Amino acid sequence: MSIEGVLKEGFVTTTADKLINWTRTGSLWPMTFGLACCAVEMMHAGAARYDLDRFGVVFRPSPRQSDVMIVAGTLCNKMAPALRKVYDQMAEPRWVISMGSCANGGGYYHYSYSVVRGCDRIVPVDVYVPGCPPTAEALVYGVIQLQAKIRRTNTIARQ
């Protein structure tokens, strides 16, 4: 957290936006939407070697308890309404990480009649993680990029 000033009396001054965003970056609770082989790498990122828990990322089983959705894998046309329904059940503010070539743009199955050519056609995506499949390190980097994006956003609406 960048603190604008520390006074000699022991007070710390900052804005409410920066304080709220700093607390949000330390408690991201993702809802996993694993559709293909990228989900295996997502499990690696949550395991002991990479340990997303150290960033405050704790996987949740319910969309009502989540504020981040990680879409990992090929999204077909029949699964798209379910993806949107799960996204709509998440509380605000909510963010989406698109993980892998298939989730980003259809990947290997881009020209198939049954594949959505990117989950950004169904839900707004905040961070794209490239690769086929992307490594666990790439997902950790994507989470760090999402934390940086959250720190930059304005939380309190200004007139």
From Swiss-Prot:
Cofactor(s) of this protein: [4Fe-4S] cluster
SUPFAM superfamilies assigned: HydA/Nqo6-like (SSF56770)
Record-listed E.C. numbers: 7.1.1.-
Chain sites annotated for binding [4Fe-4S] cluster: 37-38, 102, 132
GO annotation, biological process: aerobic respiration; electron transport coupled proton transport
Subcellular location: Cell inner membrane
UniProt keywords, alphabetically: 4Fe-4S, Cell inner membrane, Cell membrane, Iron, Iron-sulfur, Membrane, Metal-binding, NAD, Quinone, Translocase, Transport, Ubiquinone
Gene Ontology, cellular component aspect: plasma membrane; respiratory chain complex I
Transmembrane portions of the chain: none
Cofactor: record remark: Binds 1 [4Fe-4S] cluster.
Domain of life: Bacteria
Record-level Gene Ontology MF annotations: 4 iron, 4 sulfur cluster binding; iron ion binding; NADH dehydrogenase (ubiquinone) activity; NADH:ubiquinone reductase (non-electrogenic) activity; quinone binding
Keyword Phosphoprotein belongs to the record: no
Membrane topology summary: Peripheral membrane protein
Reactions mediated catalytically: a quinone + NADH + 5 H(+)(in) = a quinol + NAD(+) + 4 H(+)(out)
PANTHER family tied to this protein: NADH DEHYDROGENASE, NADH DEHYDROGENASE [UBIQUINONE] IRON-SULFUR PROTEIN 7, MITOCHONDRIAL
Function, in words: NDH-1 shuttles electrons from NADH, via FMN and iron-sulfur (Fe-S) centers, to quinones in the respiratory chain. Couples the redox reaction to proton translocation (for every two electrons transferred, four hydrogen ions are translocated across the cytoplasmic membrane), and thus conserves the redox energy in a proton gradient.
Subunit and partners: NDH-1 is composed of 14 different subunits. Subunits NuoB, C, D, E, F, and G constitute the peripheral sector of the complex.
Annotated family: Belongs to the complex I 20 kDa subunit family.
Annotated protein name in UniProt: NADH-quinone oxidoreductase subunit B
